[in-house]
Amino acid sequence: MTMPFYVPAEQQMKDKADYARKGIARGRSVVVLQYDDGILFVADNPSRALHKISEIYDRIAFAAVGKYNEFETLRLAGVRYADINGYQYDRRDVTARGLANAYAQTLGTIFTETAKPYEVELVVAEAGLDADSDQIYRLTFDGSVRDEHGYVAMGGQVDAVEQALKERFTEGMSLSAALRAGVQSLEAQESGRRLEAKALEVAVLDRNREHRLFRRLPAPRIEELLAEGA
């Protein structure tokens, strides 16, 4: 008689975590950083159709790395969550913190109760009235949440990108300076690499706008900003 196969719970969790980390590391990186007038999102993403950066609600945006169909499912769920809560209560009641908590519950449940975890990492950000009131939350595949300030890097060779961001980031940067710092940090993954504007997906939450703060930056505008002070 054969003995039933048993895997300790600790080993199951470790295997799932390793699986998710490997999937996320295979993707291209995204960086999120604060600048003087809001929050900047920069993705190494040449695709014009498959977005890694998206608007969720008036002051809230979403960035993700990993498996596209999985984080797109989460993005759509986030939009529905925001729309329903804004309609039933008040638009001011829709916050990045509330959305991050909802995502954390979903990701945590998937990680613990299903055989395959989501291969995703997310940032949910909300532009406040000033830099001190900005909210940036980083969510990992197991539902863990971290409240970040200044900058975040996800996906790809994340250690190299984070180190480059640490060296370049300063509080109160202009948009052009923040964009250069973000792009140079993405380029740090590979010696001699240079990212052109058409290979980048860039968006901002601009606190100087009214109502909807999210806007995408087209390639000509990206080139113009990168040239400033270069």
Swiss-Prot record:
Query: What is one process in the GO biological process aspect for this record?
Result: modification-dependent protein catabolic process
Which GO molecular function terms does the record list?
threonine-type endopeptidase activity
Tell me the route in metabolism or biology where this protein functions: Protein degradation; proteasomal Pup-dependent pathway
The annotated modulation of its activity is: The formation of the proteasomal ATPase ARC-20S proteasome complex, likely via the docking of the C-termini of ARC into the intersubunit pockets in the alpha-rings, may trigger opening of the gate for substrate entry. Interconversion between the open-gate and close-gate conformations leads to a dynamic regulation of the 20S proteasome proteolysis activity.
Q: Where in the cell is it found?
A: Cytoplasm
Q: Which Pfam families match?
A: Proteasome
Name the keywords, alphabetized: Cytoplasm, Proteasome
User: What is the protein's major site of localization?
Assistant: cytoplasm
Query: GO terms for CC?
Result: cytoplasm; proteasome core complex, alpha-subunit complex
Function, in words: Component of the proteasome core, a large protease complex with broad specificity involved in protein degradation.
Subunit comment for this entry?
The 20S proteasome core is composed of 14 alpha and 14 beta subunits that assemble into four stacked heptameric rings, resulting in a barrel-shaped structure. The two inner rings, each composed of seven catalytic beta subunits, are sandwiched by two outer rings, each composed of seven alpha subunits. The catalytic chamber with the active sites is on the inside of the barrel. Has a gated structure, the ends of the cylinder being occluded by the N-termini of the alpha-subunits. Is capped by the proteasome-associated ATPase, ARC.
UniProt lists the family membership as follows: Belongs to the peptidase T1A family.
According to UniProt, the name of this protein is Proteasome subunit alpha
At the highest ranks, the source species' classification is: Bacteria, Bacillati, Actinomycetota, Actinomycetes, Streptosporangiales
Q: Which gene encodes it?
A: prcA
